[in-house]
């Protein structure tokens, strides 16, 4: 199904605050974890045509253009984010568009780039097929999402302690068992984006993800589970230590299979 309307409404309502947070580098998860990993795994972009899917308020497009891309187009389902993007980066082409129905000719782009967008979709298959259609032969789709292990972890918090638990507690010699987390099933959950913004996204196990890649005509050529950058260690030690051992994001690099 298309992006949940409640997600669109939430991003429209908080578009200015969201955009500010993207630009002031206060989101350490982006700055020291997700963004270096996805940018570091981009292919060569000289003279390439690029689509930014879920471009938000447009910040990533300047970087992609600086790598030599010939044409960079950004799309997002949020009208307010696209409005901010057009104000901020008037030299770029921004459009309000649903990822499941990409309104471009066949084989139009060399690369489709998407940062932390796909997990807002209940089903990826229609979007994957739409992306495949607009990619040129051997074109690349690179995107990041919340890691399914991380979204499967159960959260426990009180005033003093914040815990993230996965596994089970088996009470010996009884039928009692406590299970923490749920990896193998697909379900909707709330995700904290910022102080102002909590939206729904969707957990799905890796087995479903891989099957949808195959069904939509893609070959998986790389998978990255990034650790936090070492530059964050001194200033954000807890963040750095957690993300040396526990994955929060995953980057997929797919290639359109030759016809």
Where are these regions (language model features)?
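Short alpha-helix
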Residues: 200-224
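A short glycine-rich, Lys/Arg-flanked "PGG" loop and its adjoining helix->strand segment in the class I
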Residues: 125-140
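Class I SAM-dependent methyltransferase SAM/SAH-binding core
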Residues: 51-53, 57-101
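A short acidic, Gly/Pro-enriched loop at the edge of an enzyme's catalytic core
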Residues: 100-111
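Core SAM-dependent methyltransferase catalytic element
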Residues: 216, 238-259
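Conserved class I S-adenosyl-L-methionine
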Residues: 1-45, 59-63, 81-84, 88, 141-187
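A short SAM/SAH-binding and catalytic strip from SAM-dependent methyltransferases
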Residues: 110-125
